[in-house]
Amino acid sequence: MAIDRLIARREVHLREKTLWRMLYETAGRSEEILGVNIEDLDFAGRRCPAKAKGAKSKSRRRGQVREDFVLETLYWDAGTARLLPRLLKGRTRGPVFVTHRRPGPGKVVSPRDICPDTGFARLSYGQARALLDHHTAVRGVGTGWDLHEYRHSALTHLGEQGASLLMLMAKSRHKKPENVRRYFKPSPEAIAELTSLLAPGNSSR
């Protein structure tokens, strides 16, 4: 699988490998994953809360923070579980994904977006997108993969493996069935495997 080959490349930094694997296994939106803090992680349960796109507010007060919104749960599996401890290296607070430098002078950054141990700032969407493009572009800057492709690929692969519409909606957290049906586009390989069920003497019939 192309995603596995990309993550296995030696020149790819551990931060990027972890981010890409987590995006794929959670089928989460990039902004959701980039917004997760270490203290949000449930390592044993392989899950974490995240502020989803269009998250409902718990109150109407001004200056709302993350805790003022209804959070949704993202689930990951063994690949992310192996990489996260290596990435964090004992850090227990602050953003999971950080830059390799401190914010510039005069730049106002929320305390939640700063690692209290290193002073490094949260990795932004633009930075994460540029890093992915750097490793996947073949026809110049801007021609590489988009971060959303991990979510799309995850849901497509689940659809090909027979996940039901309801399960895909639960995993993706889409509210409308029509937004999920597009992932039910089986590959030629999946159609060939399905066709094999019609072979003479197939015991499953």
Swiss-Prot record:
Domain of life where this protein originates: Bacteria
Record-linked InterPro entries: DNA_brk_join_enz, Integrase-like_cat_sf, Integrase_catalytic
Keyword set, alphabetical order: DNA recombination, Transposable element
Active site: 29, 58, 148, 151, 174, 183 (o-(3'-phospho-dna)-tyrosine intermediate)
Tyr recombinase domain residues: 1-196
A single GO BP: DNA integration
GO molecular function: DNA binding
Family: Belongs to the 'phage' integrase family.
Protein name stated in the entry: Uncharacterized 23.1 kDa protein in transposon Tn4556
Organism: Streptomyces fradiae (Streptomyces roseoflavus)
